[in-house]
């Protein structure tokens, strides 16, 4: 998951520590498959030589689609090339091996040429989860054996942001704004605390105080959290 550009070198370090060839072209087998997503996947070319496919946009739905395709590829003994050709047909999937960037003398991009015979689409459109209430939420999570930074239940109130700050990458790529209902969020938060044993719950979004039902949700969650000594917080 590529959250910011300074993490690119970490990706290469991870591949090196795993004993894997860095470049996708030097990994001819279907397994392992290197997949990248996150906000930086909207500008995939810096890591294009090293990643097999990028997920452009939101991953809840498209991840299930390419995993199902990957299972089929394993069962039917597809080659890596065959799998990537089929994966490229899934909306939101960008396979860099099927495209060749052409640059001008000043280093700016002139065009993207599609590799002949690849069947890759001319444009890759980002995936957007239309209905946040219907999107998957990880009520049951894997609890780490060591202390981690975000050692709490994270409730995503809504996706996107109404502010449009010019410096904020996430505020633009996660448009349009889509909210979860307060009833469902309260249900998720309580269930996640019961399952994990976490003693803190965070109401997380790009601008959480813009959530229209914030007071209603906080009242509901405080009635649950206070008797159980569970903290309820907003991100900074």
Language model regions located:
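Conserved structural-core and active-site-/substrate-pathway-adjacent residues in large, well-folded domains
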Residues: 1-3, 11, 52, 93, ...
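Glycine-rich beta-alpha loop elements in corrinoid/cobalamin-binding modules
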Residues: 1-114
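Flexible loop/turn segments at secondary-structure boundaries
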Residues: 5-8, 41-44, 62-64, 101-103, ...
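Conserved SAM/AdoMet-binding glycine-rich loop
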Residues: 6, 190-236
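Beta-sheet entry/capping signal
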Residues: 33-34, 53-54, 92, 152-154, ...
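Structured alpha-helical segments in the cores of large, soluble enzyme domains
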Residues: 34-37, 41-44, 63, 153-161, ...
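N-terminal [4Fe-4S]-dependent radical SAM core
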Residues: 96, 107-154
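Canonical Radical SAM [4Fe-4S] cluster-binding loop centered on the CxxxCxxC motif
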Residues: 147-183
């Amino acid at each position: 998951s590529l959250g910011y550009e300074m993490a690119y070198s970490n990706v290469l370090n991870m591949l090196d520590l795993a004993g894997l060839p860095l470049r996708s072209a030097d990994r001819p087998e279907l397994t392992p498959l290197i997949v990248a997503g996150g906000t930086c996947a909207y500008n995939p070319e810096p890591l294009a030589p090293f990643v097999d496919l990028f997920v452009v946009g939101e991953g809840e739905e498209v991840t299930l689609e390419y995993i199902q395709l990957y299972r089929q590829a394993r069962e039917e003994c597809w080659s890596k090339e065959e799998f990537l050709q089929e994966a490229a047909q899934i909306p939101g999937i960008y396979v860099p091996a099927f495209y060749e960037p052409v640059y001008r003398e000043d280093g700016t991009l002139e065009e993207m040429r599609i590799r002949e015979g690849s069947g890759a689409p001319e444009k890759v459109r980002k995936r957007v989860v239309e209905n946040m209430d219907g999107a998957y939420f990880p009520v049951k999570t894997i609890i780490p054996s060591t202390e981690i930074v975000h050692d709490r239940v994270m409730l995503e109130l809504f996706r996107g942001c109404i502010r449009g700050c010019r410096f904020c990458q996430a505020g633009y790529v996660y448009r349009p704004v889509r909210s979860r209902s307060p009833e469902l969020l309260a249900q998720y938060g309580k269930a996640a605390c019961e399952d994990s044993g976490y003693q803190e719950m965070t109401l997380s979004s790009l601008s959480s105080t813009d959530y229209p039902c914030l007071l209603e949700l906080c009242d509901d969650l405080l009635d649950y959290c206070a008797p159980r000594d569970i903290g309820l917080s907003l991100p900074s």
